């Protein structure tokens, strides 16, 4: 249920809840729909209700805003998300929740995500990875980032390394960088970068 290639998912309109979120938070700009997008969530999953939680989206946006650019003219400035990034990546991924009877609480509906980013999009992908691994309140979280070659894997890892190294928020949370991994020992959570060619 991540990305479907059928016609009904090509540039389909935003869910009412996400449009309401953008309007209620005063997020300016018209989101540009991607070619493919995550389908609208069902009303129920395995008999359990699904809801949109705007506070969860607020928390993620605030967390990402605590991270800072590490390169170029924006180096040292907080990450700011565009309306498109919020509407089509952050809100659908973190806002939709399903009731989990076993945990006795609402959990994120989307447990897996595929985000294809063009070149120069690694900062957003890194921020989402950091949030999923260390800011989601889940012990033992694993985020795997794949690349075709060692050089690509290194290029994927560098922005993650830089965010972790230069973020007081992540340092305070005990996040450590090691070879090709970023770990939070107290929660056993990890981000790994792997390549298909060794």
Stretches with model-predicted labels:
Residues 1-198:
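Phosphate/NTP-binding elements of NTP-utilizing enzymes
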């Amino acid at each position: 249920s991540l990305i479907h290639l059928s016609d009904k998912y090509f540039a389909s309109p935003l869910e009412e809840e996400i449009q309401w979120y953008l309007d209620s938070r005063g997020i300016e700009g018209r989101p540009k729909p991607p070619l493919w997008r995550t389908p609208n969530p069902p009303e129920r999953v395995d008999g359990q209700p699904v809801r949109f939680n705007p506070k969860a989206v607020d928390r993620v946006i605030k967390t990402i805003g605590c991270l800072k650019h590490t390169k170029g003219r924006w180096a040292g400035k907080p990450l700011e998300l565009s309306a498109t990034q919020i509407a089509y990546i952050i809100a659908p991924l973190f806002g939709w929740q399903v009731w989990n009877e076993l945990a006795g609480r609402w959990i994120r509906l989307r447990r897996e995500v595929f985000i294809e980013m063009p070149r120069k999009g690694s900062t957003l992908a890194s921020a989402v990875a950091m949030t999923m691994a260390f800011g989601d309140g889940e012990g033992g979280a694993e985020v795997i980032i794949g690349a075709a070659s060692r050089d690509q894997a290194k290029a994927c890892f560098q922005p993650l390394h830089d965010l972790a190294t230069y973020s007081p928020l992540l340092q305070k949370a005990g996040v450590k960088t090691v070879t090709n991994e970023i770990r939070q020992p107290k929660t056993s959570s990890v981000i790994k970068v792997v390549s298909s060619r060794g």
